[in-house]
């Protein structure tokens, strides 16, 4: 009791198991001080009752929480007995080594600083501790036990964590910097590294013989570590969920992988591609793999420019491949006649053991180069005798299943294949068809409605003879090839409506109802279909088109010109055109175009019932092309149209009229 301090000297052990009330510090110079509660160290307040390790050790044989800080003025050891747990406020080791021993748990709740820590046994939990080492030795030496690091900053000039015994390392939201290895394992060690809320790019080295490192990447984790292992050691990786990421920036060798997260090959550095080599088995838990790939002809090994996943064992489950495309694209069917071959294209995944056909699949229907090439690259699977062993990237083990990107073709049954089917020789005769025009009616002086339905008739016969397989092109291309006909049909749809309106002027003039100034508006619609005179093998696409528009116009002036009456006006029509390419399930697309048409109109009516109608129009078109799921391309176009119509109306009996044009 009193205001003094307790100083432990001598090599023996001293035990404090009661309640002490001294107010000063506790300092251990030599030997060991044994305690079973925080009250054993006196009753001083937090500011003047710290524990100072001055060369001796602290042995804890009870469970308790202390608000004291622990200072090290020399190397020191804190031991916690089995089944006991002791927590402290902060530790400050300076340049000295702090050793945790005993089978119990020691917790540092509120950080502090340390330069070298050794875990001999039991569990050590460090929360918000700043650890920095300029020493040649590792910052954290783990012989046995469980090391939990939560928050804080950890940096080391040399190795960060050196593991010499069976242990578990748990990292949660720790800032890590290491000039050496982030983690290094010695011989005959089995260790588990678990990560949560963690980004780490520390190198991992498993150099010892018969050592095993199991890595569990959990919630909100990105593992960007380069991994290196000896032939006698094992690294097993488990990406536990879809917020678990593994970034690969160089060739990486591991033994077994379970992927319920995301494996990401980092963007190319100087056009260098990387391999993930898996010595054992791979299990896909609906995870993803992102690879960088040059879309080219492929074929020869040195032309298959892509990151690769190479698995010597078996594959289970399913995995989605996300290909980041580069290059200008090319037709991978390089054999004479474009006959498909297992050597063509670009290998992404090779398996030495067994794998189902759907073990790997693309995240989309096909891969393309965007605007650089029209080809569809799809993923095809080869197995057993189908595999071209000249494309073997597994080394000494034959490839049993090969997943390759190749140019997609259609065979005689409509199936997607990676080249020309030699049996694809059935003939076809088709009649071609052309564009259709809508027919509609409108009524009213100033308002009106128009509706129409049209079916186009072609101008010639389709190709005859042998059908030939051909490459599939990207879906937006079918809309691009249909776009001129679709926009022409929409333009005719607008002009036809304006021409009908100009015809109203002539009718009103004959009935003496015409006005020098007249305003009108009407809603118009049409449904049309188009059938190409080319067959599908020659990229002939059929489509259905739905047009809707609002037409607003005026005749702003009229004047006499000799024996003629002249009317001048303007029209603005806005609407949309929806076009659905229908005759190719593998290349179908849907196009929505918003249109704005500005027109100047003129009508000349002769006293002898002759008339001339003229329309000069400018159209602006903006829209998008869709596949089954999303927007895939944009449409932007414009047009100029000139329409001149000459006619005369003849009156027949019983109020019948005939009007040649």
Report the location of each language-model feature:
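Outer membrane beta-barrel translocator domains of Type V secretion systems
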Residues: 423-424, 428, 458-658
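Extracellular beta-solenoid/beta-roll
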Residues: 3, 53-62, 68, 73, ...
């Amino acid at each position: 009791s009193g205001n003094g301090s307790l100083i432990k000297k001598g090599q023996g052990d001293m035990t404090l198991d009661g309640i002490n009330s001294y107010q000063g510090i506790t300092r251990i110079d030599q030997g060991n001080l044994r305690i079973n509660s925080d009250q054993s160290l006196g009753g001083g307040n937090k500011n003047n009752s710290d524990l100072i390790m001055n060369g001796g050790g602290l042995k804890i044989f009870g469970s308790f929480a202390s608000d004291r800080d622990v200072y090290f003025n020399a190397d020191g050891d804190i031991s916690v007995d089995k089944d006991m747990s002791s927590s402290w406020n902060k530790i400050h080791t300076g340049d000295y080594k702090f050793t945790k021993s005993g089978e119990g748990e020691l917790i540092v709740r509120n950080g502090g600083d340390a330069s070298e820590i050794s875990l001999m046994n039991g569990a050590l939990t460090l929360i918000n501790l700043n650890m920095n080492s300029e020493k040649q030795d590792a910052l954290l030496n783990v012989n046995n036990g469980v090391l939990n690091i939560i928050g804080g900053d950890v940096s080391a000039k040399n190795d960060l964590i050196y593991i010499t015994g069976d242990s578990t390392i748990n990292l949660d939201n720790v800032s890590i910097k290491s000039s050496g290895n982030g983690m290094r394992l010695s011989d005959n060690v089995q260790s588990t590294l678990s990560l949560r809320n963690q980004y780490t790019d520390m190198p991992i080295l498993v150099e010892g013989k018969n050592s095993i490192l199991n890595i569990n990447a959990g919630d909100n984790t990105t593992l960007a570590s380069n991994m290196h292992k000896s032939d006698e050691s094992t690294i097993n990786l488990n990406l536990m969920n879809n917020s678990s990421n593994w970034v690969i920036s160089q060739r990486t060798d591991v033994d077994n992988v379970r992927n319920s997260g995301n494996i990401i090959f980092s963007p190319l550095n100087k056009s260098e591609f990387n391999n993930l080599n898996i010595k054992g088995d791979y299990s896909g838990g609906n995870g993803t793999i992102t690879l960088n790939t040059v879309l080219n002809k492929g074929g020869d090994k040195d032309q298959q420019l892509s990151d690769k996943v190479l698995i010597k064992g078996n594959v289970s489950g399913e995995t989605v491949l996300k290909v980041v495309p580069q290059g200008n694209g090319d037709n991978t069917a390089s054999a004479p006649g474009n006959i498909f071959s297992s050597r063509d294209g670009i290998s992404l995944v090779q398996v030495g053991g067994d794998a189902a056909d759907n073990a790997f699949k693309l995240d989309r229907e096909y891969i393309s180069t965007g605007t650089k090439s029209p080809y569809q690259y799809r993923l095809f699977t080869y197995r057993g005798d189908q595999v071209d062993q000249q494309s073997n990237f597994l080394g000494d083990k034959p490839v049993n299943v090969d997943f390759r990107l190749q140019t997609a073709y259609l065979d005689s049954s409509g199936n997607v294949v990676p080249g020309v089917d030699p049996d694809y020789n059935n003939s076809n005769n088709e009649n071609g068809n052309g564009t259709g025009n809508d027919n509609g009616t409108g009524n009213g002086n100033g308002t009106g409605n128009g509706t129409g339905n049209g079916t186009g008739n072609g101008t010639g016969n389709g190709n005859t003879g042998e059908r030939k397989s051909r490459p599939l092109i990207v879906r937006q291309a079918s809309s691009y090839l249909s776009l001129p006909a679709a926009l022409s049909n929409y333009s005719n749809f607008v002009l036809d409506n304006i021409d009908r309106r100009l015809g109203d002027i002539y009718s009103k003039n004959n009935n003496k109802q015409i006005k020098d100034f007249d305003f009108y508006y009407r809603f118009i619609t049409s449904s049309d279909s188009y059938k190409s005179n080319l067959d599908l093998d020659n990229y002939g696409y059929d489509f259905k088109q739905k047009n809707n528009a609002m037409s607003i116009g005026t005749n702003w002036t009229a004047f006499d010109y000799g024996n003629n009456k002249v009317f001048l006006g303007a029209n603005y029509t806005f609407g949309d055109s929806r076009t659905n390419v229908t005759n190719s399930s593998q290349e179908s697309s849907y196009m929505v175009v918003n249109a704005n048409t500005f027109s100047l109109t003129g009508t000349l009516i002769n006293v002898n019932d002759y008339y001339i109608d003229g329309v000069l129009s400018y159209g602006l078109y903006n829209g998008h092309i869709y596949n089954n799921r999303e927007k895939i391309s944009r449409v932007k176009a414009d047009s100029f149209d000139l329409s001149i119509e000459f006619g005369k109306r003849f009156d027949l009996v019983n109020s019948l009229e005939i009007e040649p044009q």
